[in-house]
């Protein structure tokens, strides 16, 4: 399937160090396509009992210590070529390799810092822009000229805000799961253009009917830094996105989710598109805290156009994983 999509697919023996090294080298050398490395592995590889009987491919070795599964730790270490008396021993030749690599990387870092220093001195305006992008902050904006219809739908108000941002926030990227004309992320698209093969000059990503993939890509953008990702779809499809949304909250990523059509009044689609219970699930995620004890998520459900504008202000200005419904 991935080969049919145009990916660079490499299949290897996941226990062969040389094959792993060659696959990673080939992946780094590939400049045009994404790479998928498939490592075929055996569960409990090398695990044996005291009498030498194999514990490979046994489900019991998963999710508990080998000894609890019935294998013998010392016998397994010996079977894998290690020293059962000192199982965490670092061989001298391995230590030398890591020492040499440490020095190589230190030199590389020194070189990169010199290059950055030179670039910044020669490109002062771009340097300031880069710092702004990486800070996660946005330019100061005057919302007074933003026109919102007083009795319009909140998603229509959201479209107006997105159009406003498209002209003022250079590093914001908006995505939609094949619903931009319905979730009204097209307010952003109308002021830019979608990515296409060989052309990434726009600021809109048409993700297709792939909600989880879209959410994961948004997480990746946030982890890389320098851009503000937002993605939209119907609220009922948040179920497909949930693993990525939860991880975004735990990782304290500044990702904005735009979920529309959030009640039983969603037109002719019927019960399959009526997210009656979903808000309770998402609201519970507000209780997630990161390792610093900080709340990682803010859930916003604006009732009218004015609240929608305020919700977007919070979404843009706060460094939280934000849900804008």
For the regions a protein language model found, what residue spans apply to each?
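Glycine-rich ThDP/TPP pyrophosphate-binding loop and its adjacent helix/strand module
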Residues: 1-95, 270, 278, 284, ...
């Amino acid at each position: 399937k991935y080969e049919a999509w145009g990916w660079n697919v490499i299949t290897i023996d996941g226990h062969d160090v040389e094959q792993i090294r060659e696959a990673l080298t080939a992946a780094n050398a590939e400049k045009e396509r994404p790479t998928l490395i498939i490592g075929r592995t055996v569960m409990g590889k090398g695990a044996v009992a005291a009498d030498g009987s194999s514990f490979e491919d046994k489900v019991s070795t998963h999710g508990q210590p080998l000894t609890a599964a019935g294998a013998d730790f010392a016998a397994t270490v010996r079977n894998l070529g290690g020293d059962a008396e000192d199982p965490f021993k670092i061989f001298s030749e391995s230590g030398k390799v890591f020492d040499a690599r440490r020095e190589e990387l230190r030199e590389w870092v020194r070189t990169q810092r010199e290059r950055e220093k030179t670039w910044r001195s020669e490109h002062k305006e771009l340097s300031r822009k880069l710092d702004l992008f990486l800070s996660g902050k946005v330019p100061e904006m005057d919302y007074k000229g933003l026109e919102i219809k007083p009795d319009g739908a909140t998603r229509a108000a959201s479209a107006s805000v997105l159009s406003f941002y498209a002209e003022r926030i250079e590093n914001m990227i908006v995505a939609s799961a094949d619903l931009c004309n319905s979730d009204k992320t097209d307010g952003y698209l109308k002021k830019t253009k979608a990515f296409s093969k060989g052309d990434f000059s726009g600021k809109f990503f048409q993700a297709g009917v792939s909600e989880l993939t879209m959410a994961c890509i948004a997480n990746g953008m946030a982890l890389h830094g320098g851009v503000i990702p937002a993605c939209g779809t119907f609220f009922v499809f948040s179920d497909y996105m949930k693993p990525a949304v939860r991880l975004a909250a735990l990782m304290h990523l500044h990702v904005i989710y735009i979920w529309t059509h959030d009640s039983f009044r969603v037109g002719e689609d019927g019960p399959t598109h009526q997210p009656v219970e979903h808000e309770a699930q998402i609201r519970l995620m507000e209780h997630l805290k990161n390792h610093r004890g900080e709340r990682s998520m803010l859930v916003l459900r604006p009732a009218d156009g004015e609240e929608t504008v305020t919700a977007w202000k919070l979404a843009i200005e706060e460094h939280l994983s934000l849900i804008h419904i």
